[in-house]
Amino acid sequence: MAYPFELGFQDATSPIMEELLHFHDHTLMIVFLISSLVLYIISLMLTTKLTHTSTMDAQEIETIWTILPAIILILIALPSLRILYMMDEINDPSLTVKTMGHQWYWSYEYTDYEDLNFDSYMIPTSDLNPGELRLLEVDNRVVLPMELPIRMLISSEDVLHSWAVPSLGLKTDAIPGRLNQATLTSTRPGLYYGQCSEICGSNHSFMPIVLELVPLKHFENWSSSML
């Protein structure tokens, strides 16, 4: 989860988020190198009064600054497209959960079970127990099995919402009348927090998301107790 004064991303808990972190580092290094080169050239031009007349109209330089940016864009586009295809790929999910956004709470339905659904509201600050997180705790957590592919079907009953869990690399819009899907896989158990990431009204800040990833045996026990 996020911490105060955090400068980087949350720790990755899914293969997709790990790929996104690597891609971020890759593109950031390219931006750093380009910025350093531009600043060096600017400082060189400002600190010298000499002008190289042959560079004012040189075919070689024009060729270089046409081909080099094209190569850089390809180096950015290829890993980006690879990650996009990975995020869209859903092969034989072990579990499907339908998520509906409301003003201002989430409702969940486990479609593989006959009658397993619930609403998830934020716990008010006055009702929190010691150690619980303000504006992030909910009355009903979404319990899911770890290390298994899970399909999330996401939509909305009223206005635009966005279902987002940063540590899992998830952010999917909840649009009325449209069903979007996302793949979720966690490599380790734990509690993972998110929030609605689309301004949806006066209580937009009070729509937390809490996923509890547990071993498969614990999930089976939980689902049996909920039915």
UniProtKB/Swiss-Prot annotation:
Q: How does it sit in the membrane?
A: Multi-pass membrane protein
The membrane-spanning stretches of this chain are 15-45, 60-87
**Gene Ontology cellular component list:** mitochondrial inner membrane; respiratory chain complex IV
Report the main location listed first in the record: mitochondrion
Highest taxon, organism lineage: Eukaryota
Q: How is the cofactor bound?
A: Binds a dinuclear copper A center per subunit.
Q: Which residues bind Mg(2+)?
A: E198
Relate the outcome reported for changing I123V: In strain: Isolate MSB 53282/NK 7980
Q: Which residues lie on this side of the membrane: Mitochondrial intermembrane?
A: 1-14, 88-227
List the subcellular locations.
Mitochondrion inner membrane
How does the record describe its quaternary structure? Component of the cytochrome c oxidase (complex IV, CIV), a multisubunit enzyme composed of 14 subunits. The complex is composed of a catalytic core of 3 subunits MT-CO1, MT-CO2 and MT-CO3, encoded in the mitochondrial DNA, and 11 supernumerary subunits COX4I, COX5A, COX5B, COX6A, COX6B, COX6C, COX7A, COX7B, COX7C, COX8 and NDUFA4, which are encoded in the nuclear genome.
Record-given protein name? Cytochrome c oxidase subunit 2
Q: What is the lineage of its organism?
A: Eukaryota, Metazoa, Chordata, Craniata, Vertebrata
Gene name of this polypeptide: MT-CO2
